[in-house]
Structure formats: structure tokens, C-alpha cells
């Protein structure tokens, strides 16, 4: 194996020109990845690189996945930092494609219904990143059925996330962050497994306020 990726027991490894397993930071196809001492690609480098002054976000509508990028030393946003599972708009109310800059954030925001979402970051118009919406402005507001749709198209156009991931964007991505939404955006990390909650559970297990 040379200059190629290999998946072994659920983890990604990269073998360089000499056939040796890559460790540490490495550019592959223009992106900068980190491989542990065991050779496994690390699929969340947030703590490794620390909080950055700026990020860029891409959303892939087909995969229902979000990836956050940081810039390298030359200002190229080529370091995948984190990836999130999301829900985008249903076919009748699709999430718009294009490149946008975030104009506003809200700790809670009134959404369709009305319903209420946490850790909202506006993308464009009425389209926001937000937690799965519930019936009131408390952490105990969810419909399990709604929550369990995360990872597939389910919204009126917004990009739904679990509370942990919506909060990460809210806390870390400054206003003016560039967000690109398409059907073809590269998703360089594996799509995280969705969390399922039992009928009758009304809170998000990733919510730090529960």
C-alpha cells in the first residue's frame, strides 16, 4: 500500500509513498489530517488545536452531515476539525444551497409551530443551525419521535443538530462565519452515529443543562 487510505476495524489509516503508516499531522489531497501514534486518523482535533479565531462550516444535504474546518498557517481552511450528524429540510421545504455568512445567534429561538430551539445560529433568512426543537423553552421539551429523525431530512429548512453540536457552533463560531451548503461537499470524517431516545424521554442526552 502506498499513498492510500485503508480502513481497519472501523478506523482510517494512511500509508505514505514508502508504504509506511502515517502518524502525526499529514497533508493528504490538500487537507491536513492528524494521525495518532497508533496510526488512526483522529476524527475530532478540536482539543488538539484549541479554539481557533475563525472556522468555516460545510453542510452536505445528501449525507445530512456538517463538517467544521480550521485554517492552516497560510489561512487555507483545510483542517477538518469536527463533524456532526444533522437533519436538513424535507423535499418540500429544502435547506437552501449556497455560501452564506452567519448574521445572528440566539440562546433560544422561536421556530415553526411555534416550537423552540436551543443554541441557534442563523445561516440565511429563516434558516438556522439549532437543536431539535421542542414545545417550550426548557431542556425537557422534546418529542422522542422528532429527535430520533436526526441524521435524515426532517426540517422546514433549518439544519437540526443535537444540543451538544448546536452548542459547539454557538460557542465557537463567531458571527460572520462562512457556511457552504451543497449536495456534494466533501465529508472527510465518518458521519457520527445518531443517538436514539426511548418514547417518553423528553430531553436530549447530549444537553449539558440536563
Please name every model-derived segment.
Residues 16, 36, 68-72, 183:
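Residue-level signal for short segments within beta-strands and strand-turn junctions
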Residues 17, 37, 63, 104-105, ...:
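Residues immediately flanking
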Residues 10, 30, 54, 64, ...:
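Short loop/turn microsegments at loop-to-beta-strand junctions
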